[in-house]
Amino acid sequence: MLRVPLADGTLVATPGVPSKDIIPSLLSTSDVFGTGWFAAEAANVKPGMTVAVVGDGAVGLLGVLSAKQMGAERIIAMSRHEARQKLAREFGATDIVTERGDEGVARIKDLTNGIGADAVLECVGTQESMKQAIGSTRKGGYVSYVGVPHGVQLEGQELFFAHVHLHGGPAPVRRFLPKLIDLVLNGKVNPGKVFDLTLPLEQVAEGYRAMDERRAIKTLLRP
């Protein structure tokens, strides 16, 4: 027996039974891919834009993939982890920035001729990551924030003179599901690559531990 809460509104059927090899990608559409897609949409990503992504977890990496699908010309991924940098490039990143904080902002300004990115996706939720996102954005640009905030406080005057658009919050994933599922079924994207650790359900605690210790990007649990 399987119980799906509010299935009339939340359950989206696939056209037939999908093959096992795309199950991880389909699973991602209902969570991290949907959130990454919202991050790109909320940042108003358009064809030809320069986009920066703060955060190299599953959501940030799929924010890179989403920005690529939306036509971004240049995508700067901020990451210090080699395996995640490699995946970011597979998903469409053109540049990698390893610096953080003020140094990270300066590096993005260097890469954009002192202007800043047209759009920045904040996918972490810390004070430092939010300041880094705002500081990396050009005047009149867009910042989306989908990382659950942890002690984030924005200084009013600093935000006022930054002159950027802010849009974020919990991702309305259900709205994107039909499109994202279609992208997966048609072989246009492979977001399931973020699942780099597979464990049996009884080892769920180890799965969370591995993600917390940065030994895994995303854990896939099997019964």
Task: Name each model-derived stretch.
Residues 49, 141-142:
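Glycine-centered, small-residue-biased loops immediately flanking beta-strands
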Residues 131-135, 174-223:
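C-terminal hydrophobic helical "lid"/dimerization subdomain
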Residues 53-56, 68-132:
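Adenosine-nucleotide cofactor-binding segment
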Residues 1-54:
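NAD(P)H dinucleotide-binding glycine-rich loop of Rossmann-like/cofactor-binding domains
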Residues 35, 59, 67:
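Hydrophobic/small residue at the entry helix of a nucleotide-binding pocket
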Residues 81, 149, 172:
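Residues in the short beta-alpha loop(s) of Rossmann-like NAD(P)-binding domains
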Residues 147-163:
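Rossmann-fold NAD(P)-binding glycine/threonine-rich loop
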Residues 43-45, 112, 124, 136-138:
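A generic alpha-to-beta junction signature in SAM-dependent methyltransferases
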